[in-house]
From Swiss-Prot:
Subcellular location: Mitochondrion inner membrane
Protein name: ATP synthase subunit a
Function summary: Mitochondrial membrane ATP synthase (F(1)F(0) ATP synthase or Complex V) produces ATP from ADP in the presence of a proton gradient across the membrane which is generated by electron transport complexes of the respiratory chain. F-type ATPases consist of two structural domains, F(1) - containing the extramembraneous catalytic core and F(0) - containing the membrane proton channel, linked together by a central stalk and a peripheral stalk. During catalysis, ATP synthesis in the catalytic domain of F(1) is coupled via a rotary mechanism of the central stalk subunits to proton translocation.
Gene encoding the protein: ATP6
Pfam families attached to this UniProt entry: ATP-synt_A
Keyword Ion transport: yes
UniProt key word Transmembrane helix: yes
MF annotations from Gene Ontology: proton transmembrane transporter activity
Keywords: ATP synthesis, CF(0), Hydrogen ion transport, Ion transport, Membrane, Mitochondrion, Mitochondrion inner membrane, Transmembrane, Transmembrane helix, Transport
PANTHER family in the record: ATP SYNTHASE SUBUNIT A
Amino acid sequence: MERNGEIVNNGSIIIPGGGGPVTESPLDQFGIHPILDLNIGKYYVSFTNLSLSMLLTLGLVLLLVFVVTKKGGGKSVPNAFQSLVELIYDFVPNLVNEQIGGLSGNVKHKFFPCISVTFTFSLFRNPQGMIPFSFTVTSHFLITLALSFSIFIGITIVGFQRHGLHFFSFLLPAGVPLPLAPFLVLLELISHCFRALSSGIRLFANMMAGHSSVKILSGFAWTMLFLNNIFYFLGDLGPLFIVLALTGLELGVAISQAHVSTISICIYLNDATNLHQNESFHNCIKTRSQS
């Protein structure tokens, strides 16, 4: 098969005129390719493999919830699907109660839908890339950055709604000398804003690095397996077992990232709703007003 003047044979690119086969990059699995091109007036809209993967994840979650909750609710003796949904439903409130303090149960309950949707979507979205011929949505930095920034902005709005201008008191830790206040305020502001960036980078880096490692070792084991040499075949058993172990590890990392992201959201919400009774900010303002 020819592609752009090159001959593609068994997943390798053979350049005419010499050079031998050139193996495709392991990063090709993260490429975004249009499936359906749409032109709406002056705007070009394309339905890509990324869009398809996100719709499949959403459809899987909705289908699972529908199967469990149909006919008026679950069964007294839960099956595997109902047990999974109940486990997710019980896990998120317990996490909220553990990580967010100083609030009543009714106030915490308001955060449950956002945190539950984020955790459920991440739980099904991250391991999706381990399925052959699928696409890893969270392997793209723009996707993870958009998710982290939207959550960061929402948490900041919650902090202003609850505390008003007193929300700025988190910029000045308690017991800080007044000459160091400007430097620490700037440092705390940068640290606070960097939370949105760090959450997106952490998820993106874990997904891309792990999936790339599995792809590289899988390609190496596959090549060794089909070499016409018994020693290469026997030597391939080691990399093959490593690939199996790394696949299980990457699946665990993909699931644990949903847990880590949810804990981060709860910690940020706790910092936004509980300012740890920091009074140095008010003392600084009071001193300036009296002088």
